[in-house]
Amino acid sequence: MLTADDKKLLTQLWEKVAGHQEEFGSEALQRMFLTYPQTKTYFPHFDLHPGSEQVRGHGKKVAAALGNAVKSLDNLSQALSELSNLHAYNLRVDPANFKLLAQCFQVVLATHLGKDYSPEMHAAFDKFLSAVAAVLAEKYR
């Protein structure tokens, strides 16, 4: 459960991320593909080389979806319903992969934001990403 302080920290964090969505999102995807190569199977039609248009475009979509979720912290299920349907019914992505991408996104933020990514902000974002992963996995039950 996200506290009022968590929500405040997440809003502050996303203000720092907003101008870098494509960069951070694509870097998180690239990191996931390198660290967890089995995740590449969900992208057979993508050029997965670093810096490819497809990875950059999808990274931007991922980060934008997270940004929309930050704007809807009190109603994540509704905000992510369409994405949950897409990943569960059409793409059939194993929900374990959401946590892998979340870990990679954390590393990207820590790398780029440095001291601006405080332990409290990290903890709030971790709770948020866990909540997002849970919502995305809801339709699998």
From Swiss-Prot:
Single biological process term from Gene Ontology = hydrogen peroxide catabolic process
Q: In which tissues is it expressed?
A: Red blood cells.
Q: Which residues bind heme b?
A: H58, H87
Q: Per the record, what is one GO cellular component?
A: blood microparticle
Transmembrane residue ranges: none
Molecular functions (GO terms): haptoglobin binding; heme binding; iron ion binding; organic acid binding; oxygen binding; oxygen carrier activity; peroxidase activity
Q: Which domain of life is it from?
A: Eukaryota
- Keywords for the protein's UniProt record, in alphabetical order: Heme, Iron, Metal-binding, Oxygen transport, Transport
The UniProt entry, under Gene3D superfamilies, shows:
Globins (1.10.490.10)
The residue ranges of the Globin domain are 1-141
Quaternary form? Answer: Heterotetramer of two alpha-D chains and two beta chains.
Family from the record = Belongs to the globin family.
Q: What is the stated purpose of this protein?
A: Involved in oxygen transport from the lung to the various peripheral tissues.
**Protein known as:** Hemoglobin subunit alpha-D
> Which species is the source of this protein?
Chloephaga melanoptera
